[in-house]
Design a protein with these regions (language model features):
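N-terminal Rossmann-fold NAD(P) dinucleotide-binding loop
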Residues: 22-23
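Active-site-adjacent segment of FAD-dependent monooxygenases/related oxidoreductases
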Residues: 50-123
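Helical element adjacent to the flavin cofactor pocket in flavoenzyme catalytic cores
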Residues: 109-131, 136, 162-164, 169
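Conserved FAD-binding catalytic core of PHBH/FMO-like flavoproteins
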Residues: 120, 156-157, 163-167, 173, ...
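A conserved short coil-to-beta-strand element within the FAD-binding core of flavoproteins
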Residues: 132-147, 153-155
């Protein structure tokens, strides 16, 4: 990755912002071979933790981006989340150890480590360049692309550029660059969103909270008694107690009526608050900040060739840990669609499904986060007592208790009807518009591999005990080849055909897989299908269709229609392209 501000005339995609959303998008696009320029206004990495958690869906995205192993090595996983009373007794607990999407459901992280890792790993792509200390100032667009003007950040100090890894050589003069598309991943105060005139709907919450980030001093062992994530439901001082990897820990305290920002950020007050839970002499306070939060979502996510993502598109209260995760989901949804349009594999209308799909899911995450905030931050003794009685009653009820203990109140990765790229659902359990499971499967060589690592980055056809290729017309096969589709036959564990003439496995042609854990076979059955059915899977691992093999060509015709693909459309070779530079 070239961090120097060399003159570049054009790229495929310009990204404004190198936070988790922008960095994830850069990885996904870079892996697909597109040329990318990322403009990051901060000349050096912003070293404070903000996000502390991500989930299995987002780790699946990081797997697709090729960075999951490096990130998970520095995460704390499978940590129970608890609702705790003021006296220390547990009111309720949420935890799951299964892996429906291939990764732990609960992953606590230290954001400076995560962002540094994402940024450093972009160096593997010669077609991706990060320009630090550069901020987007204006842009214009036409039917062919976007022209972006960027300049040295107004607060940039040239002494900041002494760190070659984190800074760039900065030309103080404005520069312009041409891109096929511009993505504004530039945060809640998005310059891109404001320039587009896109408004946001939702609510601003006036209730302030004090966040205190701690780092345990070297040689100390002062966090052993706080192994879990806890909402401390104390009506006198609602508190969040959050473990993080390494020596880090976070507390959040809700301000009560009459308490001010100046009072609560006072070092003595901070010391008194954290001393309820830890010995303050064994910690360094990395950050203390009073903040309020927003629950907002943008009314539009695309205008022409300019799109917004992450906090620029939605602002999520922190109480479900879904702010960063929602932005990562945006990147996954958007990356393959931009790639397909640029390479002539789909028409531009495909990009409209980005907003229609992601809006409702992001809004659902915002809503559940607000509900969780209301649940844990009750300051009335009467309301708190009623809440505690309700929780105990729910947990004593078998179905509802399981629903709460397993965290099934969190919105599933499912798109609302009539909003998604895919065939309509026939019944409540139809898989269309839903993320497919990701178990380990067994290859014909006897290796156990996560399913996505075999399906790749394009479309996939998975036949249950049937070779989907056999049922494809010539026209269907042509479309699927254009989409870089992979084909798989899935067998129940131990049921793969044997004999000298049955081993047809070829990773470029047909994957013969065994469902070791039984999750995929169960998924077909839940959807109302058995042997002989085929699932058409999108590049982001959502289901386009599930049909009987005899109806497969009908589903592929529908795919062709929804992609707006037609023979003769330009298809760009799927190879990395170096940034095009002025001679």
């Amino acid at each position: 990755m070239n961090n120097k501000n060399e003159s570049v005339t054009s790229v495929d995609v310009i990204i404004s912002g190198l936070g988790p959303t922008g960095a994830t998008l850069a990885h996904l696009l870079g892996k697909r071979g597109l040329s990318v320029l990322v403009l990051e206004r901060e000349p050096m990495f912003y070293g404070n933790a903000r996000a502390v958690y991500t989930d299995d869906e987002c780790m699946r995205v990081m797997q697709a981006a090729g960075v999951a192993a490096e990130l998970s090595a520095n995460m704390q996983v499978d940590t129970p989340a608890q609702w705790v009373l003021a006296n220390g007794k547990i009111l309720g607990q949420y935890w799951r150890l299964d892996r429906p999407y291939g990764w732990p459901i609960i992953n606590f992280l230290y954001q400076p480590w995560l962002e540094t890792t994402l940024s450093d790993l972009l160096e593997r792509y010669p077609n991706v360049r990060v320009a630090r200390g550069r901020e987007l100032t204006q842009f214009t667009q036409d039917e062919h692309g976007v022209t972006v003007t960027h300049q040295a950040t107004s607060t940039f100090r040239f002494s900041d550029a002494t760190d070659a890894r984190q800074a760039c050589e900065v030309d103080p003069d404005p520069q312009t660059i041409r891109g096929r598309y511009l993505v504004g991943a530039d945060g809640g105060r998005s310059t891109v969103r404001e320039a587009l005139g896109i408004g946001m709907s939702g609510k601003n919450f006036p209730e302030p909270w004090l966040v205190v980030d701690l780092e345990m001093k070297e040689g100390e062992d002062a966090l052993r008694h706080l192994p879990y994530f806890s909402f401390i439901c104390d009506p006198d001082c609602p508190t969040v107690c959050c473990p993080q990897p390494g020596r880090f820990h976070r507390f959040e305290f809700m301000l009560m009526p009459g308490q001010t920002r100046e009072q609560m950020e006072d070092p003595t007050v901070v010391r008194n608050l954290i001393s309820r839970y830890v010995d303050p002499d064994k910690f360094e306070v990395k950050r203390k900040l009073v903040y309020t939060f927003n629950a907002l979502v943008a009314k539009d996510w695309r205008k022409g060739r300019v799109l917004i993502a992450g906090d620029a598109a939605h602002m999520t209260p922190q109480f479900m840990g879904q702010g960063m995760s929602s932005g990562v989901r945006d990147a996954y949804n958007l990356a393959w669609k931009i790639d397909a349009v640029i390479k002539g594999q789909a028409g531009e209308r495909l990009l409209d499904t980005y907003g229609s799909e992601r809006f409702h899911h992001a809004k659902a995450m915002i809503d559940i986060s607000v509900q969780m905030k209301d649940f844990v931050s009750m300051s009335s003794p009467v309301s708190s007592l009623m809440r505690n009685l309700l929780v105990r009653t729910v947990l004593a009820t078998p179905f509802l208790g399981r629903y709460v203990r397993e965290g099934r109140f969190k919105p599933a990765p499912t798109y609302v009807p009539d909003s998604y790229l895919g065939m309509p659902r026939r019944h409540r359990r139809s898989p269309e518009g839903r993320m497919i499971p990701q178990p380990e499967v067994r290859t014909f060589k006897g290796q156990r591999v996560l399913l996505d690592d075999l399906l790749g980055d394009g479309f996939a056809l998975i036949g249950l005990e049937v070779d989907p290729r056999v049922h494809l017309s010539q026209a269907s096969r042509k479309l699927l080849d254009i989409q870089n589709t992979r084909f798989a036959t899935l067998f129940p564990f131990g049921a793969r055909p044997q004999g000298a003439d049955t081993d047809r496995s070829n990773t470029s042609e047909l994957l013969e897989l065994e469902d070791v854990q039984g999750e995929m076979v169960a998924w077909f059955k839940r959807s109302g299908f058995s042997s002989g059915a085929v699932a058409v899977v999108r590049p982001d691992k959502f289901t386009f269709a599930m049909v009987e093999a005899a109806d497969l060509n009908r589903a592929i015709n529908e795919l062709k229609f929804q992609l707006q693909w037609s023979p003769g459309a330009e298809v760009v070779a799927d190879e990395p392209r170096l940034l095009r530079k002025i001679a």
